[in-house]
Amino acid sequence: NKNLYKIINKGVLENKGVEPAIEGDHRFGVSLIEIPPGQGANLHSHETEEVFFPLNGKMIVFWGDQAQYQVELNQWDCFSVPIGLMRGFKNPNEHILIVYSVVGGTDQEVGKITWHPNVIKLAEESGLIFDQEGYLKDKK
């Protein structure tokens, strides 16, 4: 699983208990994402823009309703994703990838993650459900 370190604003996340290192009324969120080899994030979208910068290796970003497009980013490349576009990413390296991520909007504007229907189906098959607020959680 990937680790998500919130630097400015909570931004978009499934773990409601996370607190950012820098609090305040910022119009953007900054995070560092640690992604183990072969791991990443499945197709999803946000209500605001998102920008990725892989800091220590390559990163594969895929997008489109069926993930029909993809690009391999090199270290320090930048990739900007517009509002509402289904996207995902993967670490193709043999080491942990660290990604600098910026998401537009305040915590209130960002909203929740919108998962692709296929991702929701896989999550439910693996024992996850959505709570009353729309967040994924274990059935237990």
Model-derived features: positions:
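Short histidine-centered beta-strand/loop micro-motifs
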Residues: V18-G24, A41-H46, W63, Q70-E72, ...
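Short, charged/polar surface micro-motifs in flexible loops or helix N-caps
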Residues: H26, P37-Q39, K58-I60
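Conserved short histidine dyad/triad with adjacent acidic residue
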Residues: N9-V18, G29-S45
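A short beta-strand-loop-beta hairpin characteristic of the jelly-roll/cupin
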Residues: S45-Q75, L85
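Double-stranded beta-helix
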Residues: G88-K140
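A short, N-terminal "cap"/entry segment at the start of jelly-roll beta-barrel domains
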Residues: N1-R27, L128-K140
